[in-house]
């Protein structure tokens, strides 16, 4: 049965419609937020998937270009693979809902959000997040929700809930926040060096709005929600776990306390073989369940050690960072490079400087724009000791690259100050946790090595969490998580920023949410960590950006011309600009507002091209004298090029003081002569006089 529900969200009406569309899904809803419309659905398989040890959830955010009245480009004329923005939005929706499903559920669950109409003032990502929450909550799929979501902006010191397009352009931060009525489940932020306390207060304000959304969704569930289905738990049988625990607990404790990752993995692997052999007769054909029990035991040992001993399995204090090191100038031919190491995590980042014509064009359902600063993140198999081939970036790689990108954008000089495009690439060479934050630190090193005048160094670090499952009020937060603490812990709270404030946040959790106190502690830990990394490591490796760019980096000269003169510089069919490029060997980019960028490693060539362009763009005025080149001779005079692409006629009567019988008696093609502009007629033709120029030259000499 069709039902419609509405609430006010940030001064605009949010409407949820159920019981009409996509009725074969387990749950579905149409979300209207202003003129933004999202179709959200949640579907579960009838039976669990065999042979897996994880919850098979997929979340998709599908952009349709008809939502903004566009026809896709290219030959096929239909949407292709998801855009980077769509992938990142899928991840933002996935992270707050995933921890709220039962951990032992093995039925496939697919959540699909289709963007059908977009009004730029009303964020489709928030409408999709709320839509996903509604679709799952009213379905029969087990779920400990609902969640709500908002975007936070900061304009003139005021926190704005779901800022419109104009407010987003002015905002010092863009924070996507999600949570249940009781706790925060997801934070994704980009900020212009916002102090930690300001960010914390904004999160608390945003949560107040989220509580209203959760109440709204709970009201919908009461009216149209289905009873949740029962499922077969995939958890380890209690009797098996007790036997495995009795046999392997002490050995597992010894194994996980090995400080070296490879040594620890080897000991755990050996213990697995011993346990399988010892229990094979008692539990026949239960090899996979024994492995699951050992995994559960390893997790228990790691968590107990942190909670009870108050320190880490590698011997560190809770607020202690692993051994740090940093180097710059690793690769001689790149424009800049930096190597950052934190324990057994090692990231090499390079920077390549390019012309403004190298910026990335972003053409999707958002307002068309360009991206000048790009960061790509690579995570090869060898970084974790695995023999596997690379199949291109997945969602994780794209997400980590975007996080590192957001972290550095606030400190990049403006286009006016430094007219370059940037491409950074982070190669993860070793991974034992927190590679995305290693990429942030590597980016700072590479940019400073390249001579980019960044506003301040940026560092990134993560905070971890272990909550006592029997007493949730007992928890421990700690700084700089390594891989095993990420696997078995409850939180990966990544924060990047300068010594003055935050530039990016990404929060992943495995529990049903975080209290304000946990978030406060995470902010304090990561702030301390940022300061230590910047002051003790980055600034000791390279105290300030290099004064000069790499000799292999292109040099850019900029100038401004009248936009009306752009067509003259380009010429018919690009003839003039191609001629300049051929003569000088430079690369030229021209913006619509008349900004011209000349890029080349050869400064002399750049100056030559600049002179030509300025000459073309210059207005020719009657009375001016030019040194021009004879380019064509006729019976009635000579055509002289006085500026690139601009020539005028010197009539035979104006060639000399005395009478001239034949043009060739005075000038030849290729001669350079002084000429004076006598007239520009109504048709734009330029009349020149050599005779007047000679007379003017003589007058000057006499003076």
Curated annotation (Swiss-Prot):
It is found in: Cytoplasm. Residues 554-613 form the KH domain. The keyword Cytoplasm applies. It catalyses: RNA(n+1) + phosphate = RNA(n) + a ribonucleoside 5'-diphosphate. GO terms for cellular component: cytosol. Gene3D superfamilies: GHMP Kinase, N-terminal domain, K Homology domain, type 1, Nucleic acid-binding proteins. CDD domains: KH-I_PNPase (cd02393), RNase_PH_PNPase_1 (cd11363), RNase_PH_PNPase_2 (cd11364), S1_PNPase (cd04472). GO terms for biological process: mRNA catabolic process; RNA processing. The keyword Transport does not apply. Its main location: cytoplasm. Residues 623-691 form the S1 motif domain. PROSITE patterns: KH_TYPE_1 (PS50084), S1 (PS50126). Its cofactor is Mg(2+). Mg(2+) binds at residues 486, 492. HAMAP family: PNPase. Involved in mRNA degradation. Catalyzes the phosphorolysis of single-stranded polyribonucleotides processively in the 3'- to 5'-direction. This is Polyribonucleotide nucleotidyltransferase. It comes from Ruminiclostridium cellulolyticum (strain ATCC 35319 / DSM 5812 / JCM 6584 / H10). The gene is pnp.
């Amino acid at each position: 049965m069709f039902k419609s529900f509405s609430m006010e969200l940030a001064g605009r009406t949010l409407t949820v419609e159920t019981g009409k569309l996509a009725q074969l899904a387990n749950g579905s809803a149409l979300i209207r937020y202003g003129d933004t419309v999202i179709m959200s659905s949640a579907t579960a398989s009838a039976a669990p998937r065999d042979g897996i040890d994880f919850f098979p959830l997929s979340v998709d955010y599908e952009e349709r270009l008809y939502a903004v009245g566009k026809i896709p480009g290219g030959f096929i004329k239909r949407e292709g693979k998801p855009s980077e923005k769509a992938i990142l939005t899928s991840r933002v929706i996935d992270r707050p809902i995933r921890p709220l499903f039962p951990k032992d559920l093995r039925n496939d669950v697919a959540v699909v959000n289709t963007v059908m109409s977009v009004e730029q003032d009303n964020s489709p990502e928030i409408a999709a997040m709320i839509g996903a929450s509604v679709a799952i909550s009213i379905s029969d799929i087990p779920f400990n929700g609902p969640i709500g979501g908002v975007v936070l902006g900061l304009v003139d010191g005021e926190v704005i809930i779901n800022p419109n397009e104009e407010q987003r352009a002015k905002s010092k931060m863009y924070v996507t926040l999600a949570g249940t009525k009781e706790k925060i489940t997801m934070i994704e932020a980009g900020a212009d060096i916002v102090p930690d306390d300001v960010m914390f207060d904004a999160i608390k304000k945003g949560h107040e709005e989220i509580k209203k959304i959760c109440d709204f969704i709970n009201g919908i569930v009461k009216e149209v929600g289905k009873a949740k289905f029962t499922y077969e738990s995939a958890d380890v049988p209690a009797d098996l776990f007790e036997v495995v625990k009795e046999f392997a607990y002490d050995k597992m404790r010894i194994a996980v306390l090995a400080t070296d990752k490879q040594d620890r993995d080897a000991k755990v692997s050996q213990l697995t073989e011993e346990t399988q052999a010892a229990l094979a007769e008692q539990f026949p054909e239960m090899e996979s369940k024994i492995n699951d029990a050992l995994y559960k035991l390893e997790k228990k040992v790691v968590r107990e050690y942190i909670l009870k001993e108050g320190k880490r399995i590698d011997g560190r204090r809770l607020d202690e960072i692993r051994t740090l090191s940093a180097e710059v100038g690793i690769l001689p031919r790149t424009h800049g490079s930096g190597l950052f190491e934190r324990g057994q995590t090692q990231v090499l980042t390079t920077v390549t400087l390019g012309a403004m014509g190298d910026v990335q064009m972003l053409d999707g359902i958002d307002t068309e724009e360009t991206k000048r600063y790009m960061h790509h993140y690579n995570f090869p198999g060898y970084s974790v000791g695995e023999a596997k081939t690379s199949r291109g970036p997945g969602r994780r790689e794209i997400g980590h690259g975007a996080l590192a990108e957001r972290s550095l954008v606030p400190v990049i000089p403006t286009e006016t100050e430094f007219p370059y495009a940037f491409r950074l690439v982070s190669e993860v060479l070793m991974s034992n946790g927190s590679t995305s934050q290693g990429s942030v630190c590597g980016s700072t090193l590479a940019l400073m090595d390249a001579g980019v005048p960044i506003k301040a160094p940026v560092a990134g670090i993560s905070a971890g969490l272990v909550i006592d499952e029997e007493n949730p009020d007992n928890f421990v937060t700690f700084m700089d998580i390594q891989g095993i603490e990420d696997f078995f812990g409850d939180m990966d709270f990544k924060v990047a920023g300068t010594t003055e404030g935050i530039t990016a946040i990404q929060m992943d959790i495995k529990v049903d949410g975080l209290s304000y106190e946990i978030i406060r502690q995470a902010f304090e830990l990561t702030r301390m960590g940022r300061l230590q990394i910047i002051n003790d490591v980055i600034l000791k490796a390279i105290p300030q950006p290099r004064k000069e760019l790499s000799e292999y980096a292109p040099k850019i000269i900029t100038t401004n011309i009248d936009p009306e003169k752009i067509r003259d510089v380009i010429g018919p069919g690009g003839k003039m600009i191609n001629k300049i490029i051929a003569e000088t060997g430079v690369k030229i980019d021209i913006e619509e507002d008349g900004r011209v960028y000349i890029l080349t490693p050869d400064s002399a060539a750049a100056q030559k091209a600049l002179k030509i362009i300025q000459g073309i763009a210059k207005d020719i005025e009657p009375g001016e004298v030019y040194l021009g080149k004879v380019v064509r001779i006729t019976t009635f005079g000579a055509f002289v090029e006085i500026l690139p692409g601009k020539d005028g006629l010197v009539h035979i009567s104006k060639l000399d003081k005395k009478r001239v019988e034949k043009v060739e008696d005075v000038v030849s093609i290729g001669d350079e002569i002084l000429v004076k502009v006598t007239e520009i007629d109504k048709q734009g033709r330029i009349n020149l006089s050599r005779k007047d120029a000679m007379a003017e030259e003589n007058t000057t000499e006499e003076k």
